[in-house]
């Protein structure tokens, strides 16, 4: 109703879960910014909001038309048939925006900021900085035409881009150069030739629809791809030695057969809803799939060429709940409301239990006897420590971009260095 009339505010997925999409208007965000500004004036220790009090109630139009200022601010899970009494107390994801309506930050279900963006004040919508949680910010510079001319990496390789007619030159901070030659336009521009930093050259060919039809490597070896004119499906591949592999499809564009250069054929068959019911290998061995009912998307059993049958039970969310092998040995699986595996139960009482933190990272694996292995992470999500059941601790240190630079175990430290 009102400003949100005609907007989608709820979604129900195929498993019956219901999600609420929280939409906000520019005026609502402006009012919230003014409240924060007022609060910051009365509390000097409180950081002043980015937009201060200059948060406009409306947004100017764009080249695509008026901007009503409506943005997605949060997604909530409001109904879960499998966990009706255990709904999350916080949104699954949350978004904040600048005073110009640009995406400012993304927060996960633990309310941890996982991505952040910076924009050019003189060019609304032009991103000049991007950062993942625990990582340095990547910066971007543009030319007058709005093209990226420099990508600045404070902890690694940076890149400079030079644009010419049908040619882009990419130079990294070690002065290594790659040249991309392009053809086409109006959305069909494609890279047809690459000059790599080591002096080698590769070529690519495309059809009138911009689909890849040939590739020539640095040694001059050419691979060709035949395409169905209508669907774009690959119908044949011819390798540099002239050997051809053919592909066949049904009316639903599902692969039904592959004929290799030696003449041997592998086949796939589907039922009317399009589910895979059998696969026959090049050697003639067939695996068959059976489904519980006409609506099941995942197979209940598979039977191989020897007649051995395996059984699977699935949750309404497509998670494997039980697997029984051909000897009758069964393994069962349990999951939490976020779809993460929490337990594995095997025969003879052999079980493993898993726990996760509020960001969904694995923090503990415990067996039925209570032996526990614990895991620790840094802000970027890198695994920094593993503590085994006997108390031994191994640690890993990382650089700014997540590459391991040292490992320590049993008092012994190993260091790693990298080139660029």
Explain the meaning of each model-derived region.
Residues 1-420:
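Extended charged/polar low-complexity repeat regions
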